[in-house]
Amino acid sequence: MSQFTLADLERIVAERASVTDGTSYTASLVAKGQPKAAQKLGEEAVETVIAAVSGDRAGVVSESADLLYHLAVVWNIAGVALEDVLQELQRRTAQTGLAEKASRPKG
C-alpha cells in the first residue's frame, strides 16, 4: 500500500506553485489563474467519468490521479486547505444523510 497521502500532494502543489524558473507545470497553471485551473479540473473530471463508464479500470486510476492533482491546484489558488475539506467531510458523515435531512428546518 502506498504511503503517499493527499497531504503530500497538497504540500508538493504548494511547493511547486512557487517555483519561478519556468520548469514547473504547477506554477504555470497557478499563474494562469483559477479559471484555467478550474477548466483543467473539469476536463479531468470528464475524462474520469468516461473511463469509468467505459469500464477502463486503469484509465479510472490514471484520470483520478489527474483529477486529484488539479483539485489540489484549485484548492491552492482558492486558499482552501485539505484540512478544511476533511473537516467538512467529517461534519457531513457524522450522521446519516436521512438524519441530516430530517434535522433541516421545515418550510
From Swiss-Prot:
- Per UniProt, the enzyme's principal EC class comes to hydrolase
Where is it located? Cytoplasm
Q: Which CDD domains match?
A: NTP-PPase_HisIE_like
Transmembrane stretches, start-end: none
Which GO terms of type biological process are on file?
L-histidine biosynthetic process
- Give the record's pathway: Amino-acid biosynthesis; L-histidine biosynthesis; L-histidine from 5-phospho-alpha-D-ribose 1-diphosphate: step 2/9
- Enzyme Commission number: 3.6.1.31
* Catalysed transformations (reactions): 1-(5-phospho-beta-D-ribosyl)-ATP + H2O = 1-(5-phospho-beta-D-ribosyl)-5'-AMP + diphosphate + H(+)
What is one GO cellular-component annotation here?
cytoplasm
Matching InterPro entries, A to Z?
Answer: HisE, PRib-ATP_PPHydrolase-like
Query: From the Swiss-Prot or TrEMBL record, what is one GO molecular function term?
Result: ATP binding
Q: Which UniProt keywords apply?
A: Amino-acid biosynthesis, ATP-binding, Cytoplasm, Histidine biosynthesis, Hydrolase, Nucleotide-binding
Q: Which family does it belong to?
A: Belongs to the PRA-PH family.
Q: What's the protein here called? A: Phosphoribosyl-ATP pyrophosphatase
Source species:
Brucella canis (strain ATCC 23365 / NCTC 10854 / RM-666)
